Amino acid sequence: MPELPEVETVRRGLEPALVGARFTTVHLARPDLRFPLPARFAARLTGQRVEALSRRAKYLVADLSSGDALIMHLGMSGRFDVVFPDGRQLSPGEFYLEGAPGQAKHDHVVFALSNGARVTYNDVRRFGFMDLVRRAELETCRHFAGMGIEPLGSDLSGEAVARLFRGRRTPLKAALLDQRLIAGLGNIYVCEALHRARLHPEAAAGTLADAAGRPTRAAARLAQVIRDVLTEAVAAGGSTLRDYAHTDGTQGAFQHRFRVYDREGLACTARGCRGRVRRIVQAGRSTFYCETCQPAP
Protein backbone atom coordinates (compact mmCIF):
# COMPACT_ATOMS: atom_id res chain seq x y z
CA MET A 1 0.00 0.00 0.00
CA PRO A 2 1.39 3.45 -0.87
CA GLU A 3 2.50 5.39 2.17
CA LEU A 4 2.63 9.15 2.70
CA PRO A 5 5.59 9.89 0.37
CA GLU A 6 4.00 7.93 -2.47
CA VAL A 7 0.66 9.72 -2.03
CA GLU A 8 2.43 13.09 -1.95
CA THR A 9 4.20 12.11 -5.19
CA VAL A 10 0.80 11.40 -6.75
CA ARG A 11 -0.57 14.73 -5.54
CA ARG A 12 2.31 16.67 -7.06
CA GLY A 13 1.92 14.84 -10.35
CA LEU A 14 -1.85 15.37 -10.57
CA GLU A 15 -1.90 19.00 -9.47
CA PRO A 16 -0.97 20.58 -12.85
CA ALA A 17 -3.69 18.61 -14.64
CA LEU A 18 -6.49 19.15 -12.13
CA VAL A 19 -6.16 22.48 -10.35
CA GLY A 20 -7.94 25.31 -12.15
CA ALA A 21 -9.76 22.97 -14.55
CA ARG A 22 -13.41 21.94 -14.53
CA PHE A 23 -14.78 18.43 -14.85
CA THR A 24 -16.63 18.39 -18.19
CA THR A 25 -17.66 14.73 -18.00
CA VAL A 26 -17.16 11.96 -15.46
CA HIS A 27 -17.49 8.38 -16.71
CA LEU A 28 -18.03 5.56 -14.23
CA ALA A 29 -17.29 2.04 -15.45
CA ARG A 30 -18.92 0.61 -12.33
CA PRO A 31 -20.97 1.92 -9.38
CA ASP A 32 -18.39 1.02 -6.77
CA LEU A 33 -14.72 0.73 -5.93
CA ARG A 34 -13.90 -0.68 -2.51
CA PHE A 35 -17.14 0.97 -1.36
CA PRO A 36 -20.13 2.19 -3.39
CA LEU A 37 -19.53 5.57 -5.01
CA PRO A 38 -21.67 8.40 -3.58
CA ALA A 39 -25.14 8.96 -4.99
CA ARG A 40 -25.11 11.21 -8.07
CA PHE A 41 -21.32 11.12 -7.99
CA ALA A 42 -20.80 12.04 -11.66
CA ALA A 43 -23.53 14.70 -11.60
CA ARG A 44 -22.13 16.38 -8.48
CA LEU A 45 -18.67 16.59 -10.07
CA THR A 46 -19.61 17.67 -13.60
CA GLY A 47 -19.08 21.40 -14.15
CA GLN A 48 -17.17 21.91 -10.93
CA ARG A 49 -13.74 23.53 -10.86
CA VAL A 50 -10.90 22.00 -8.87
CA GLU A 51 -9.67 24.83 -6.67
CA ALA A 52 -6.94 22.97 -4.78
CA LEU A 53 -5.47 19.50 -4.41
CA SER A 54 -4.06 18.60 -1.01
CA ARG A 55 -3.05 15.54 0.98
CA ARG A 56 -4.23 14.48 4.43
CA ALA A 57 -2.29 11.47 5.73
CA LYS A 58 -2.61 8.91 2.89
CA TYR A 59 -5.65 10.58 1.29
CA LEU A 60 -5.90 13.02 -1.63
CA VAL A 61 -8.43 15.84 -1.26
CA ALA A 62 -9.67 17.98 -4.17
CA ASP A 63 -11.49 21.17 -3.13
CA LEU A 64 -14.32 21.91 -5.57
CA SER A 65 -16.05 25.16 -6.50
CA SER A 66 -19.36 23.70 -5.30
CA GLY A 67 -18.11 23.55 -1.72
CA ASP A 68 -17.68 19.79 -1.91
CA ALA A 69 -14.40 17.98 -1.34
CA LEU A 70 -13.50 14.92 -3.40
CA ILE A 71 -11.65 12.43 -1.20
CA MET A 72 -9.53 9.80 -2.97
CA HIS A 73 -7.65 6.85 -1.49
CA LEU A 74 -5.38 4.64 -3.63
CA GLY A 75 -5.85 1.45 -1.63
CA MET A 76 -3.35 -1.25 -2.58
CA SER A 77 -2.96 -0.77 -6.32
CA GLY A 78 -4.76 2.42 -7.35
CA ARG A 79 -3.09 4.76 -9.85
CA PHE A 80 -3.96 7.73 -12.04
CA ASP A 81 -3.13 8.05 -15.74
CA VAL A 82 -3.20 11.52 -17.32
CA VAL A 83 -3.38 12.24 -21.05
CA PHE A 84 -2.86 15.88 -22.09
CA PRO A 85 -4.27 17.47 -25.29
CA ASP A 86 -0.83 17.38 -26.93
CA GLY A 87 -0.65 13.62 -26.40
CA ARG A 88 1.73 13.67 -23.46
CA GLN A 89 1.04 10.95 -20.94
CA LEU A 90 1.75 11.01 -17.24
CA SER A 91 1.19 8.36 -14.59
CA PRO A 92 1.66 10.06 -11.23
CA GLY A 93 1.34 7.14 -8.91
CA GLU A 94 2.45 4.31 -11.18
CA PHE A 95 3.92 2.45 -8.24
CA TYR A 96 2.14 -0.82 -9.02
CA LEU A 97 4.40 -3.34 -10.76
CA GLU A 98 2.56 -6.63 -10.32
CA GLY A 99 0.83 -7.87 -13.46
CA ALA A 100 -0.49 -5.31 -15.96
CA PRO A 101 -2.22 -2.55 -13.99
CA GLY A 102 -2.65 -0.34 -17.05
CA GLN A 103 -5.21 -2.63 -18.68
CA ALA A 104 -8.34 -0.74 -19.72
CA LYS A 105 -10.57 -3.27 -17.96
CA HIS A 106 -9.29 -1.84 -14.68
CA ASP A 107 -10.13 1.77 -15.65
CA HIS A 108 -12.96 2.51 -13.22
CA VAL A 109 -13.37 6.32 -13.27
CA VAL A 110 -12.49 8.68 -16.14
CA PHE A 111 -12.46 12.45 -15.60
CA ALA A 112 -12.52 14.68 -18.72
CA LEU A 113 -11.34 18.22 -17.95
CA SER A 114 -11.95 21.64 -19.45
CA ASN A 115 -8.24 22.06 -20.20
CA GLY A 116 -8.45 19.08 -22.55
CA ALA A 117 -6.75 16.63 -20.20
CA ARG A 118 -8.19 13.25 -19.29
CA VAL A 119 -7.48 11.65 -15.91
CA THR A 120 -8.23 7.95 -15.47
CA TYR A 121 -8.34 6.08 -12.18
CA ASN A 122 -7.11 2.50 -12.66
CA ASP A 123 -7.19 -0.05 -9.84
CA VAL A 124 -6.42 -3.74 -10.31
CA ARG A 125 -7.34 -4.88 -6.82
CA ARG A 126 -10.08 -2.25 -6.37
CA PHE A 127 -9.17 -1.51 -2.76
CA GLY A 128 -9.16 2.24 -3.38
CA PHE A 129 -12.21 4.45 -2.94
CA MET A 130 -13.64 7.92 -3.58
CA ASP A 131 -16.09 9.96 -1.57
CA LEU A 132 -17.69 13.40 -1.64
CA VAL A 133 -18.22 15.44 1.52
CA ARG A 134 -18.89 19.08 2.21
CA ARG A 135 -15.60 20.90 2.55
CA ALA A 136 -16.74 22.54 5.79
CA GLU A 137 -17.28 19.07 7.27
CA LEU A 138 -14.00 17.58 6.07
CA GLU A 139 -12.27 17.25 9.44
CA THR A 140 -15.32 15.67 11.06
CA CYS A 141 -16.20 13.25 8.27
CA ARG A 142 -15.84 9.51 8.85
CA HIS A 143 -12.49 9.36 7.05
CA PHE A 144 -10.75 12.10 9.04
CA ALA A 145 -12.55 12.29 12.39
CA GLY A 146 -10.13 11.46 15.18
CA MET A 147 -7.14 11.47 12.84
CA GLY A 148 -3.80 12.43 14.38
CA ILE A 149 -1.31 15.15 13.54
CA GLU A 150 0.56 15.36 10.25
CA PRO A 151 4.16 14.10 10.43
CA LEU A 152 5.37 16.62 7.84
CA GLY A 153 5.33 20.19 9.05
CA SER A 154 5.40 21.99 12.35
CA ASP A 155 2.85 19.84 14.21
CA LEU A 156 5.36 17.06 14.84
CA SER A 157 7.93 17.90 17.50
CA GLY A 158 9.56 16.32 20.50
CA GLU A 159 6.92 17.97 22.67
CA ALA A 160 4.14 16.51 20.53
CA VAL A 161 5.67 13.03 20.67
CA ALA A 162 5.93 13.22 24.47
CA ARG A 163 2.35 14.47 24.80
CA LEU A 164 0.93 11.78 22.52
CA PHE A 165 2.94 8.86 23.90
CA ARG A 166 3.05 9.74 27.61
CA GLY A 167 2.00 6.80 29.78
CA ARG A 168 1.58 4.41 26.86
CA ARG A 169 2.97 0.91 27.32
CA THR A 170 2.29 -0.06 23.72
CA PRO A 171 5.40 -0.81 21.62
CA LEU A 172 6.90 2.24 20.00
CA LYS A 173 6.37 0.97 16.48
CA ALA A 174 2.68 0.29 17.13
CA ALA A 175 2.24 3.78 18.56
CA LEU A 176 3.82 5.35 15.49
CA LEU A 177 1.47 3.39 13.23
CA ASP A 178 -1.60 4.47 15.22
CA GLN A 179 -3.33 6.90 12.85
CA ARG A 180 -5.16 8.48 15.80
CA LEU A 181 -1.84 9.79 17.07
CA ILE A 182 0.25 10.56 13.98
CA ALA A 183 -1.52 10.28 10.63
CA GLY A 184 0.10 8.92 7.49
CA LEU A 185 3.03 6.90 8.81
CA GLY A 186 3.38 3.38 7.42
CA ASN A 187 5.52 0.32 8.00
CA ILE A 188 8.43 1.20 5.70
CA TYR A 189 9.14 4.68 6.97
CA VAL A 190 8.54 3.84 10.63
CA CYS A 191 11.20 1.10 10.41
CA GLU A 192 13.60 3.53 8.75
CA ALA A 193 12.93 6.34 11.24
CA LEU A 194 13.36 4.11 14.29
CA HIS A 195 16.72 2.93 12.95
CA ARG A 196 17.96 6.49 12.43
CA ALA A 197 16.75 7.42 15.91
CA ARG A 198 18.44 4.28 17.32
CA LEU A 199 15.25 3.22 19.07
CA HIS A 200 14.10 -0.38 19.46
CA PRO A 201 10.65 -1.00 17.90
CA GLU A 202 9.51 -2.92 20.99
CA ALA A 203 10.43 -0.19 23.48
CA ALA A 204 7.44 1.23 25.36
CA ALA A 205 6.18 4.40 23.68
CA GLY A 206 5.80 6.09 27.04
CA THR A 207 9.56 6.10 27.61
CA LEU A 208 9.81 9.10 25.27
CA ALA A 209 8.34 11.31 28.00
CA ASP A 210 9.89 11.82 31.42
CA ALA A 211 7.98 11.65 34.71
CA ALA A 212 6.81 15.24 34.28
CA GLY A 213 5.65 14.62 30.71
CA ARG A 214 8.54 16.50 29.15
CA PRO A 215 10.11 15.13 25.95
CA THR A 216 13.29 13.11 26.27
CA ARG A 217 16.18 13.70 23.90
CA ALA A 218 15.08 10.54 22.11
CA ALA A 219 11.64 12.08 21.50
CA ALA A 220 13.15 15.16 19.88
CA ARG A 221 15.49 13.00 17.82
CA LEU A 222 12.63 10.76 16.65
CA ALA A 223 10.48 13.71 15.57
CA GLN A 224 13.36 15.10 13.53
CA VAL A 225 14.28 11.85 11.79
CA ILE A 226 10.65 11.14 10.91
CA ARG A 227 10.52 14.46 9.05
CA ASP A 228 13.92 13.78 7.49
CA VAL A 229 12.97 10.31 6.24
CA LEU A 230 9.65 11.46 4.79
CA THR A 231 11.18 14.54 3.15
CA GLU A 232 13.93 12.45 1.54
CA ALA A 233 11.39 9.88 0.36
CA VAL A 234 9.16 12.52 -1.23
CA ALA A 235 12.19 14.03 -3.00
CA ALA A 236 13.09 10.56 -4.29
CA GLY A 237 9.56 9.98 -5.58
CA GLY A 238 8.66 7.39 -2.98
CA SER A 239 9.66 3.75 -2.85
CA THR A 240 9.09 1.14 -5.52
CA LEU A 241 8.49 -2.34 -4.13
CA ARG A 242 6.97 -5.44 -5.66
CA ASP A 243 3.62 -3.72 -5.90
CA TYR A 244 4.65 -0.27 -6.54
CA ALA A 245 6.82 2.57 -9.99
CA HIS A 246 6.57 6.63 -10.10
CA THR A 247 5.62 9.74 -11.95
CA ASP A 248 5.73 9.52 -15.77
CA GLY A 249 6.54 5.83 -15.72
CA THR A 250 9.85 6.01 -13.88
CA GLN A 251 10.30 4.31 -10.55
CA GLY A 252 10.55 5.84 -7.11
CA ALA A 253 14.11 5.62 -5.82
CA PHE A 254 13.95 5.69 -2.03
CA GLN A 255 14.07 1.89 -1.79
CA HIS A 256 17.75 2.16 -2.77
CA ARG A 257 18.31 4.14 0.44
CA PHE A 258 16.68 1.66 2.81
CA ARG A 259 18.90 1.13 5.82
CA VAL A 260 16.91 -1.68 7.43
CA TYR A 261 13.61 -2.27 5.65
CA ASP A 262 13.59 -5.61 3.78
CA ARG A 263 17.31 -6.13 4.56
CA GLU A 264 17.05 -9.06 6.96
CA GLY A 265 20.44 -10.65 7.65
CA LEU A 266 22.42 -7.92 5.88
CA ALA A 267 25.01 -5.72 7.55
CA CYS A 268 23.83 -2.50 9.15
CA THR A 269 24.72 0.53 7.04
CA ALA A 270 25.36 2.85 10.00
CA ARG A 271 28.94 4.09 10.16
CA GLY A 272 31.04 1.99 12.52
CA CYS A 273 28.28 -0.52 13.25
CA ARG A 274 29.02 -4.22 12.84
CA GLY A 275 25.50 -5.37 13.60
CA ARG A 276 23.06 -7.06 11.27
CA VAL A 277 19.47 -6.36 10.41
CA ARG A 278 16.93 -8.55 12.15
CA ARG A 279 13.27 -9.12 11.34
CA ILE A 280 10.50 -9.68 13.84
CA VAL A 281 6.72 -9.68 13.43
CA GLN A 282 4.61 -7.11 15.26
CA ALA A 283 0.84 -7.09 14.87
CA GLY A 284 1.18 -9.22 11.73
CA ARG A 285 3.70 -6.90 10.05
CA SER A 286 7.40 -7.38 9.48
CA THR A 287 9.62 -5.09 11.50
CA PHE A 288 13.26 -4.58 10.53
CA TYR A 289 15.88 -3.17 12.91
CA CYS A 290 19.59 -3.38 13.71
CA GLU A 291 20.40 -5.62 16.65
CA THR A 292 23.31 -3.34 17.63
CA CYS A 293 22.16 0.21 16.82
CA GLN A 294 18.74 -0.39 18.32
CA PRO A 295 19.36 -2.30 21.56
CA ALA A 296 16.49 -4.14 23.21
CA PRO A 297 14.77 -2.25 26.04
Curated annotation (Swiss-Prot):
- Keyword Endoplasmic reticulum attached: no
Pfam families according to UniProt: Fapy_DNA_glyco (PF01149), H2TH (PF06831), zf-FPG_IleRS (PF06827)
Required cofactor names: Zn(2+)
> What CDD domains does the entry give?
EcFpg-like_N
Does the keyword section mention Chloroplast?
no
Positions annotated to bind DNA: 106, 125, 168
GO terms for MF? 8-oxo-7,8-dihydroguanine DNA N-glycosylase activity; class I DNA-(apurinic or apyrimidinic site) endonuclease activity; damaged DNA binding; zinc ion binding
Where are the zinc-finger regions (FPG-type) in this chain? 259-295
Q: What biological-process GO terms show up in the record?
A: base-excision repair
Entry-linked InterPro entries: DNA_glyclase/AP_lyase_DNA-bd, Formamido-pyr_DNA_Glyclase, FPG_cat, MutM-like_N-ter, Ribosomal_uS13-like_H2TH, Znf_DNA_glyclase/AP_lyase, Znf_FPG/IleRS
EC nos: 3.2.2.23, 4.2.99.18
Q: Which reaction does it catalyse?
A: Hydrolysis of DNA containing ring-opened 7-methylguanine residues, releasing 2,6-diamino-4-hydroxy-5-(N-methyl)formamidopyrimidine; 2'-deoxyribonucleotide-(2'-deoxyribose 5'-phosphate)-2'-deoxyribonucleotide-DNA = a 3'-end 2'-deoxyribonucleotide-(2,3-dehydro-2,3-deoxyribose 5'-phosphate)-DNA + a 5'-end 5'-phospho-2'-deoxyribonucleoside-DNA + H(+)
Q: Where is the active site?
A: 2 (schiff-base intermediate with dna), 3 (proton donor), 58 (proton donor), 285 (proton donor)
The note on the cofactor says: Binds 1 zinc ion per subunit.
Q: Per its UniProt record, what PROSITE patterns does this chain match?
A: FPG_CAT, ZF_FPG_2
Family annotation (SMART domains): Fapy_DNA_glyco, H2TH
Q: Which UniProt keywords apply?
A: DNA damage, DNA repair, DNA-binding, Glycosidase, Hydrolase, Lyase, Metal-binding, Multifunctional enzyme, Zinc, Zinc-finger
Q: What does this protein do?
A: Involved in base excision repair of DNA damaged by oxidation or by mutagenic agents. Acts as a DNA glycosylase that recognizes and removes damaged bases. Has a preference for oxidized purines, such as 7,8-dihydro-8-oxoguanine (8-oxoG). Has AP (apurinic/apyrimidinic) lyase activity and introduces nicks in the DNA strand. Cleaves the DNA backbone by beta-delta elimination to generate a single-strand break at the site of the removed base with both 3'- and 5'-phosphates.
The subunit structure is:
Monomer.
Q: Which HAMAP family match?
A: Fapy_DNA_glycosyl (MF_00103)
Concerning its family, UniProt says: Belongs to the FPG family.
PANTHER family tied to this protein: FORMAMIDOPYRIMIDINE-DNA GLYCOSYLASE
| Protein name per the record | Formamidopyrimidine-DNA glycosylase
Species assigned in the record: Methylobacterium sp. (strain 4-46)
Q: Give me the gene this protein comes from.
A: mutM
